């Protein structure tokens, strides 16, 4: 076995496939392109390739002395896996085994497990012989090597002896017992580079040592222009991305269940309101014989909940006019009360400009300038309507329908219209007219139309199958037409490119030119089709999904850091929390690629995170180290994130905050699906390159030549090529050799004839 080991190329795909052939699972090899940037943890070890020049090689052979960095203690050397390289061209396998067999927590497989158990306590020379006499390792090694060219005997005379002595050599850098060791099979002992700092990782010290070695950090290295390559042995990215996708999809289902729970509470409240309206309609129909004056007194004597002002009949009529429909929308038109005699009301006179009710955007969008069209601005200026909005009360399930979806119809002469509107919503003073019944019928019709539109849109998206989102099953329940949302939450095959600004699809003011250019040009987050559908069901199609800015990102601040590593929990009272496992806080220290991009996108100018919408984040193939995977750095995280993430009780969030968290989860799912797809495609490319590298083309060449001979074309081709070479060679030789002799021969006879 001492002969026949072939040279291996320094290629991460080759080493990854070699690790798989050894039987190791959950490990891959990646190439490091930049020594200045921080490496993503965890890293099992580094494999460093450099050019082994004759001068250096001779010096190493002569220099058998031990320097101060060499470890000569036999107990320490024999305790680690350090083997002398006794076979030529086996340095690649030696470097890989030095990393794998000195690392705990790696599933080695049967071959390497037996090797590690057999060589335990051996000296470096005995371990080197054990590697050389392992046929499994030699077979796996040579299966990924390029076939050596067969040199003809006459061609070997021109090869320089100096050039044959130049070669490349692999060494490994491994952390062992909190110290950095350099394991070189051509050295007698391991090299101890010492411990690393408290505030750094072992990879930081290894990068410094490698930079000093190749002459980047110091100018004393004579071979500063040496060719080198650096590879890292890291965990398999596919397993990591699959586990994160599994957790994210479970958390998406939990958030959808929380939204469904809120929706069911809304349906129950609307059912109670409908039953109360029906009861009052029956009471009003049975008491039609009573004089109108008595009814007016009953209206005035209706009890009002404690803590509220006494409403006048006019205020009660205004409040009743804004009764919510079953779809959850506030109706802005009010019907005047009939006179006592039952006569039709007089024709309405044009109201002065101070009392004009301007049709406005919903309350949660009205104070945003970018959500208004220029025509809306002109109407506001003409009507004298201010943009200021009083602060919102804390979230409550009872106030959900009124605080989130109440329409702001302010007038210049009335300052407490919102208070009167809430009083009108809660007192239910309409006992005489059929306004409640008409509103209920209109609400049922609007809700049925909304349900039909949602069903058609879901069917259309399922037929196209281009968004890759999970379809929502929408059905109506009961006589009130409540909507139930269910989702299968299956993995989407491709990330969605659909815009989450659902209002832009129905022609609202979201595409207003007043939106600032900075927000338009900012990097946006991937779309969330599931959140889009849920937003339409919860808030109505006309209002659209609200832009989830800093006011609605409380759930993202609390749970966004842990949503990809910890499963969320939902209680019966609607409280959502994340159990803080040990790996959740450890994940905060791990920095890297993708999640860092997300946090940079989601952080506003003031440091506040902001969930944005738009197409998927673009990926670069070089970023697919988990620096590819990009987690936020610990120092960049707000302190409230860590504090809130460790709170076991959890919090209760509004529907808009849950939608913001749902969009965040959908964005993570889309990104990790892209990363997983890239890793799978990378493995396929590794196998294709390996087949091209190791393929023996001799059989194909022999078959092709035999086919040419059978067709009678081989002789003519050979004769044609040989004749061309002879003609070119002979003509050139004669021109150079016969010029001077011809001149001499011709000159002598010419002179003789003249004489």
Curated annotation (Swiss-Prot):
Where would you say this protein principally sits, based on its record? cytoplasm
UniProt domain ULD: residue ranges: 696-724
Specify the UCH catalytic domain's residue ranges.
4-235
Reaction catalysed by this enzyme: Thiol-dependent hydrolysis of ester, thioester, amide, peptide and isopeptide bonds formed by the C-terminal Gly of ubiquitin (a 76-residue protein attached to proteins as an intracellular targeting signal)
- SUPFAM superfamilies in the record: Cysteine proteinases (SSF54001)
Q: Where is this region: Disordered?
A: 270-354, 368-415, 469-535, 593-652, 729-755
In this record, what's one Pfam family? UCH_C
Query: Active site located where?
Result: 91, 169
Q: Where is this site: Transition state stabilizer?
A: 85
Q: Where is the composition biased (Pro residues)?
A: 342-351
Task: Please list the GO terms describing molecular function.
Answer: chromatin binding; cysteine-type deubiquitinase activity
**Gene3D superfamilies (UniProt xref):** 1.20.58.860, Peptidase C12, ubiquitin carboxyl-terminal hydrolase (3.40.532.10)
UniProt-annotated site: Important for enzyme activity, residues: 184
Q: Can you say where in the cell this protein is located?
A: Cytoplasm; Nucleus
What residue intervals hold the motif Nuclear localization signal? 743-748
Q: What is this protein called?
A: Ubiquitin carboxyl-terminal hydrolase BAP1
